[in-house]
């Protein structure tokens, strides 16, 4: 496979943003971090507008000295660059309903996740730029790394080049929020969404299932709930393993384990042919994700996901997950060892 192109600060020209009106739709996790980074890089405060409903997020933006607009239509009409930083599931309703009819013909729309673009849930005019600048970190890290003078991993792509200069603008946008400092990786909404959704819908479900079944087998073999919870995750050993994997290498980190553990892990992993897992991953990727089946189902559930109690389908899934032996045992252990866990 070809290597991805990596863009650095020297590839981007901030002059492209000079005099442009920047609008942030949303001042949450990513919005608050990216708006502050952008202002600290030198965009004047009077060229930044936070579009947000009148509530705590808007109050936070005002407290941080930003100009806030509650009327989305007014905000849309003046935007040269629009960052869409509200949750993915509400973007179609808010963006298509309140922004699309009022946006400039040559606006650059910046998304931080590929989902709604890949599944064509947002409406764009062919003259508009659509670019993805997608940090691979939560907002607090996007901000704290910037403050420390460091970069953060980020994907960048052009999804629609309406003006003919979408890539330079995407790179300027990446630089101004601090994303090209460590190198922004050229990607696409398709790639980003495939990786995100496959991890969410197949990789992590398998990991949850493997922990659940290992727990069940060991519990049946006589291990105590306390010992199991600590051994398997409360000691934070899995977190440490993944941290080492990120820092030193996915396989290299094994060298920190005992010889017996290294032998057991490598021998065990190489003996598993992975055929069933591969089939499951391929089926999820092609028949559930790329076919649009999941996205259609999720869109249908959208209203329910805002509801309280039993009517919310997510709450029903939590209820079922809480009935597993692993979850029930953990609840007992946490209640009993509350002091130890603080
Ligand atoms: P948040 O959940 O933090 O967004 C909160 C913001 O969205 C607030 O300003 C909130 O304002 C606004 N909002 C929520 N609901 C509505 C609504 N119905 N109408 C108008 N505004 C609304 O989002 P994130 O920052 O987590 O995500 C933003 C984008 O960034 C998404 O595309 C996400 O995939 C992407 N992303 C997120 C990452 C993360 O770490 N969370 C990492 C990388 C990308 P109010 O409720 O006041 O209206």
Where are these regions (language model features)?
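Active-site-proximal catalytic alpha-helix in oxidoreductases
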Residues: 164-222, 226-246
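Rossmann-fold dinucleotide-binding core
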Residues: 110-197
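NAD(P)-binding Rossmann-fold cofactor-contacting core
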Residues: 25, 33, 39-64
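NAD(P)-dependent Rossmann-like dehydrogenase/reductase catalytic/cofactor-binding core
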Residues: 223-342
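A short, basic/flexible loop-to-alpha-helix module at the beginning of a structural domain
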Residues: 2-19, 73
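Rossmann-fold NAD(P) dinucleotide-binding segment
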Residues: 72-121
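A short helix->loop->beta-strand "cap" motif at the edges of active sites that frequently abuts
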Residues: 43-46, 103-107, 126-128
């Amino acid at each position: 496979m070809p290597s991805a192109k990596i863009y650095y600060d020297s590839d981007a020209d901030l002059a492209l943003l000079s005099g442009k009106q920047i609008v942030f739709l949303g001042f949450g996790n990513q919005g608050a971090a990216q708006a502050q980074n952008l202002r600290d890089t030198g965009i004047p405060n009077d060229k930044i507008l936070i579009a947000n409903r009148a509530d705590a997020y808007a109050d936070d933006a005002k407290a941080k000295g930003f100009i806030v607009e509650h009327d989305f239509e007014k905000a849309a009409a003046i935007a040269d660059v629009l960052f869409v930083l509200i949750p993915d599931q509400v973007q179609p309703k808010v963006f298509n309903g309140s922004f699309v009819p009022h946006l400039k013909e040559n606006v650059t729309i910046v998304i931080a996740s590929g989902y709604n673009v890949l599944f064509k849930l947002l409406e764009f005019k062919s003259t508009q730029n659509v670019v993805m600048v997608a940090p691979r970190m939560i907002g607090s890290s996007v901000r704290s790394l910037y403050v420390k003078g460091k970069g953060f991993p980020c994907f960048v792509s052009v999804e629609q080049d309406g003006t003919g200069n979408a890539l330079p603008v995407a790179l300027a946008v990446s630089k101004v929020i601090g994303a090209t400092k460590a190198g922004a990786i050229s990607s696409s909404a398709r790639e980003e969404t495939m990786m995100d959704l496959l991890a969410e819908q197949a990789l992590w479900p398998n990991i949850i299932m493997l922990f659940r079944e290992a727990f069940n087998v060991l519990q049946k073999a006589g291990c105590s709930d306390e010992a199991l919870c600590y051994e398997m995750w409360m000691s934070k050993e899995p977190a440490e393993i993944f941290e080492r994997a990120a820092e030193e290498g996915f396989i290299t980190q094994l060298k920190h384990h005992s010889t017996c553990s290294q032998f057991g892990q490598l021998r065990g992993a190489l003996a598993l042919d992975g055929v069933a897992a591969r089939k499951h991953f391929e089926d999820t990727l092609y028949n559930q994700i790329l076919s649009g089946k999941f996205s259609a189902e999720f869109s249908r559930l959208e209203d329910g996901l805002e509801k309280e109690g039993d009517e919310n389908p997510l709450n029903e899934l939590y209820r079922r997950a809480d009935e597993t032996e692993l979850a029930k045992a953990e609840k007992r252990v946490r209640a009993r060892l509350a002091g130890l866990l603080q």
